[in-house]
Structure formats: structure tokens, C-alpha cells
Amino acid sequence: MKVHKEGTGLLLTLFTILFIVNITLYHTVGKGMLFYSVAFVSTVLFLLVLNFFRSPFRRFPYDSEGLVIAPADGTIVAIEEVMENEILHKKCLQISIFMSIFNVHANWFPVNGTVKHVSHQNGRFMAAYLPKSSTENERSAVVITTRNGVDVLARQIAGAMARRIVTYAKPGEKCHVDEQMGFIKFGSRVDVYLPVGTEVLIEMDQKVTGNQTPIARLSK
């Protein structure tokens, strides 16, 4: 499995620091319980961070036309009608996916279309599974207009541990399912806002896989 480009710098830095710490400890105290304990913790820490930045190759295996595909790995924590007052300014169906630190944290475009809007807003860093995180945490918004003229809003939300949201989408560019929309580092959430009345294909607490699980079907 590949390492995501967002993690290469951090992993190299972490490896260098851990290597120096362990070599210094070895030459200072030699082999012993302290050295082996630190070496074990260092290995586990590096493997955990490496696992977080894994970048699996994924292709949606079916015709994606009219479908909304999960933009992230995680658990469905919200399926509800809400007023979206920041970007779309209308009532929408919100589907929210919470990503734990053990999930892949790459984000994919949920639909095919043209990027209409991209924005970033600073905010708090409360736990991403809380409903208020959608409007109070640091977040980035991407609006995609489908071929049929439907606006779909995908919002990347930072969590309690996530301090950096990366968004690759650019206004005016064509986007497709199978392409990465961005990346969120360390525990986070993605909300998708759809027209009211959209057919929902998932249920609460369901585990979904980014760019693999259909979560809704847009009306024709």
C-alpha cells in the first residue's frame, strides 16, 4: 500500500527523530529494559502514523451516474434535514461521516460534475462526532454542480486532533468520482449536503468506505 503524499514529510521527520533518540539511548545506556521499551514504543508509534497515512488505490466498480458516493471512510453519524446557512442557504439533507484515527483519511469527490465553489473557514477543534462541529469547527467547503444542475456540498471538518485540512478542488475544474478531493489529518468528519427528498441508501451507524459505498441517489 502506498503512503499518501500528505504524510511523507511528517513520516520522514518522525523516523529521523525516533532514530536519533534510539541511537542516542543505545550509546548512552546500552541494551537493557529502558532501551528495548523505548524502541518498542517508537516502533508502535511510527507504525500507527504510517497506517494513518496509507493511501489505497480505489475505483468505484459501477456506473456512478446519479449516485452520491461516500467521500470518506468512517461511520454514518447523521442523516437529517437541516438549514444550510453558510453556502447553499436552503434546507438540505445532511449525511455525515465520522472518521476515527484508524480510518483512511483521504477524501474523494462524492459526485461527478464541475467545482462551483471552494472556501475555508477557521474555527474550533471540538470532537468531530458532535453535531456542532459542522458549524463551529475549522472546515472547508466544496460545492459541485452535477451534469443535471444539482448542487452538492461536501464539507471537510477538522476534529479534536485534526489541525490541518487539505483541499485539492479548484473552482471551475471538472471533477469525478475516483478522484481525491482532499485530506484531513488525524480524526475528522465529512458532511454531504443534498437536495431534500434525495433517496438515502445508507442508515445510521453504518460503516462506509470512501469511493466505494453509495450513500444516496439523486432524483432525475
From Swiss-Prot:
The record's listing under InterPro entries reads:
PS_Dcarbxylase (IPR003817), PSD-A (IPR033175)
Q: How is the cofactor bound?
A: Binds 1 pyruvoyl group covalently per subunit.
UniProt GO BP: phosphatidylethanolamine biosynthetic process
**In chain numbering, where does the site feature Cleavage (non-hydrolytic) fall?**
187-188
Recorded topology in the membrane: Peripheral membrane protein
The name this protein carries in UniProt is Phosphatidylserine decarboxylase proenzyme
The enzyme's E.C. designation: 4.1.1.65
Q: In which pathway does it act?
A: Phospholipid metabolism; phosphatidylethanolamine biosynthesis; phosphatidylethanolamine from CDP-diacylglycerol: step 2/2
Highest taxon of source: Bacteria
Q: Which cofactor does it need?
A: pyruvate
User: GO cellular component terms?
Assistant: plasma membrane
Q: Which UniProt keywords apply?
A: Cell membrane, Decarboxylase, Lipid biosynthesis, Lipid metabolism, Lyase, Membrane, Phospholipid biosynthesis, Phospholipid metabolism, Pyruvate, Zymogen
PANTHER family with a match to the protein in the record: ARCHAETIDYLSERINE DECARBOXYLASE PROENZYME-RELATED
Protein's cellular compartments = Cell membrane
Could you tell me what this protein does? Catalyzes the formation of phosphatidylethanolamine (PtdEtn) from phosphatidylserine (PtdSer).
Where the protein is mainly located, per its record?
membrane
Indicate where the modification Pyruvic acid (Ser) is found in the sequence: 188
Protein's UniProt keywords contain Repeat? no
Quaternary structure, per UniProt, is:
Heterodimer of a large membrane-associated beta subunit and a small pyruvoyl-containing alpha subunit.
Post-translation changes: Is synthesized initially as an inactive proenzyme. Formation of the active enzyme involves a self-maturation process in which the active site pyruvoyl group is generated from an internal serine residue via an autocatalytic post-translational modification. Two non-identical subunits are generated from the proenzyme in this reaction, and the pyruvate is formed at the N-terminus of the alpha chain, which is derived from the carboxyl end of the proenzyme.
